[in-house]
UniProtKB/Swiss-Prot annotation:
Taxon lineage: Eukaryota, Metazoa, Ecdysozoa, Nematoda, Enoplea
Protein's UniProt keywords contain Disulfide bond: no
Homology family: Belongs to the MIF family.
Residue runs in coiled coils: none
Cellular component aspect of the GO annotation: extracellular space
Protein EC: 5.3.3.12
UniProtKB keywords: Cytokine, Isomerase
Name of the protein: L-dopachrome-methyl ester tautomerase
Biological source species: Trichuris muris (Mouse whipworm)
Amino acid sequence: PIFTFASNVPADTITGFFL
């Protein structure tokens, strides 16, 4: 997902923080 601040996936977490 895009807004995933509590994801276990590093890339997903970074994307969430950046977006």
